[in-house]
Amino acid sequence: MEKRTTIYDIAARLGVSTATVNRALTGKPRVKEETRRLVLQTAEEMGFRPNSLARSLARRRLRFAAVGFTSFPEFHNDFLRGVKDAGAELADFNISVDCLGFDRGPSDTPEAEAFLDGTLRDIADGGYDGVLVLGRMVDAFRYLAEKKVCAATVVNDIEDRSLRRFTICSRGRIAGRMAAELIYRMLPDRGRSVAIASGYEGMPAHRETELGFLEQTERTPLDIAEVAYNHDNAEIAYASTARILREHADLGGVYVNSFNYTGVIRAVRESGRAGEVLIIASDICEELKELIREGTVVASIFQNQYEQGRLGLHRMYEALADDAPVEDVICIDPQIVMYSNITLY
């Protein structure tokens, strides 16, 4: 069966937003006449049948939710911002979007898990059609499936993939390889040991970066002192890093494969070895930018959770509104952020 052309295909062909294509096709303002002409010409060439907009007005409003659940609001708020921007881009297509974020401290407590489970159950009972979840596996995913709410995971996947429609994530295996090679190339004495400050043992997002790091050490050999699981808790990360520094006087580098960098930095600074121990972090924020500028962190592997959120809502809309096929796993390429290119982020 031939794939029907959508406004997403036209937008991709022309390198413009779906909102621009929509305004051009519907005769709305705020579109240059040359752009409107080009959109209409391309739509005709691609065999576009302008029925998607009409269907969106005829059907009931589609309701979407997004949940950001980590110990670090600064991290998951970027994901939610991407979802909100996608909602604005789809504003003419009869949808609504509600964004919910966790801001009650560490996410590794029973109270935090109850928040995530309860929030997803409320969404299942709240008449929503789809939900994007940046979090981890809880029983409520089964309840969402029972209620026939389309669920998708972002940044981190869940173990039972039958409970979600698709996942969007960074290429974690590659991110881990990049981190290992960076440390190998930058380490003055390659005989010194390195550690991985990870999140949860077995959690897909953390497991993939760990595996990538370890795989790369087969090509660029590094002595792994320890993989520490810090449960996305800054205090646990501080304690484990301080212990590793005491036990491994030769420690030359640390790869932090989650946003949980503050405890690691504090321990390294208190040991008097800031700038001596190479630190590769993950993602980016204003504080991390400053740490890179001052040399405490040499680089960070950025997974662009904003774009994961924005793309996630678009893909979910396509799946529910247009019954379009969606890849099971949608990957975002990781990027290296260093002093030399930090102004781009």
Predicted ranges, named:
Residues 1-60:
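N-terminal helix-turn-helix DNA-binding module of bacterial transcription factors
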Residues 49-114:
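Amphipathic helical "hinge" segments at domain boundaries
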Residues 136-174, 285-293:
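Flexible loop/hinge segments that line or gate small-molecule binding clefts
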Residues 166-193, 237-238, 288, 304-321:
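Hydrophobic alpha-helical segments within soluble ligand-binding/sensing domains
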Residues 115-119, 123, 129-146, 213, ...:
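Hydrophobic alpha-helical
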Residues 87-116, 193-196, 214-235:
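Short beta-strand elements in bilobed, periplasmic/extracellular small-molecule ligand-binding domains
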Residues 201, 217, 304-345:
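Hinge/cleft segment of the Venus flytrap/periplasmic-binding protein
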Residues 75-91, 175-179, 204-222, 240, ...:
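Short, solvent-exposed amphipathic alpha-helices that sit
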